[in-house]
Amino acid sequence: MQHALGFGGKLEMHGKSETKLGIGVIGCGNISMTYLRNAALFGGVELRACADISADMAELRASEYGIRAIGVDTLLADPDIDLVLNLTIPAAHFDISLSALSAGKHVFTEKPLATSAADGRRLVAEAAKRGLLIGSAPDTFLGAAGRRARRLMDDGAIGKPVTGTAFMMGRGMEHWHPNPQFYYQPGGGPVFDMGPYYLTMLVNLLGPVERVMAMATRGQEERLITADGPFKNTTLKVGTPTNIVSLLEFRSGATVTFGASWDVFKHSNHPIELHGTEGSLRLPDPDTFGGTVSLSERGADWVDFASDSELYGARNWPYSAPDRANYRMLGVADLAGALATGRKPRASGELALHVLEIMEAILASGESRGSVAVNGTVDQPPLLGEEEAATLLA
């Protein structure tokens, strides 16, 4: 093990740099490009190697970012790697993260933490047992819009939260993704794929969920792949619900309707709205780091808070023609800061586990048509203040 960590003390790293967390990326597919590109923004992390089930893909990413392409086992044994960034497909998240923890590495994984809450609990327990940190996407709630919304909520801008809505609706993945099959199998679907952005933001703003009720259906049993690629004009069988309506009861007493559907052509619902005893708050798409947060105090006109000029809110993606803020890697940088100072990371495994338990409860309720308790709980992550957010930059 390359690390000695106690939450009362600071991390010791024995790698190339005593001040940077050495990152080894496993999984070099679509999402990896964002993380690899954004790594240079942050001072506490350093890319060192990458691996993929496809050696060619690993070599491509390595050549693009000036790092080594090596095998998975070699990466896990490499003393220069302090943290494994797990960007594999959801079905592989548990095995790769457990292997990394077993090798003495800290872990940050793409969402979901695992495809079952039982596996998620095992990962969180394994990290704790070994004195390692595990973090998980999404980290979008740490972006400019998420921080603004959290400050407003903490300041009592809407009073006591009473109710709200959250909607993720679209036509699914087969229209743009060349290999969309895994999105439509257990562990995929709109709740597991997109739900983490919405649910993580809601837990960040309202605290933990206590109980859910849901209905779940499939708009189609088969779907036609129209995206360019090897599977264009072929069909895939749907193995998980694609249209889910749920009611979330938070431990605070607030209730939120959460709808997630890949069976919608067009809609006009706002991504998230929260309503309290003193006003209402409207949030942008929680899959991005920026966008406009709007506040109405006691029925007054909406007051907009744009994010473009704020840290981790400026539009930077896609790089050729930016139309949204994408600072994936921010959660990894926050975890590096946690290791350096002895605090807990904000985009933590515990937070991701609670979100995973909520999602599992939603799908279970969708099957049983009864209410399902969310037995686990988590503390709201502490607000990422503006000064601390700036210290994460290179």
Regions found by a protein language model. Name each.
Residues Q2-Y65, L393:
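N-terminal Rossmann-like dinucleotide-binding module
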Residues M13, L83, I89-F141, G156:
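Beta-strand-loop-alpha-helix segment that lines the small-molecule cofactor/substrate pocket
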Residues V45-L47, I81, P161, V209:
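Core-facing hydrophobic residues within beta-strands of well-ordered domains
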Residues D80, T88-I89, A260:
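Short glycine-/small-residue-rich Rossmann-like dinucleotide-binding loops
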Residues G259-S268:
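Glycine-rich phosphate/pyrophosphate-binding beta-alpha loops
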Residues G6-G8, E221-G239, V245, F250, ...:
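C-terminal glycine/acidic-rich active-site capping loop/insertion
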Residues T140-K237, R369:
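Predominantly a Rossmann-like dinucleotide-binding segment in NAD(P)-dependent oxidoreductases
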Residues R68-A77:
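Short acidic low-complexity segments
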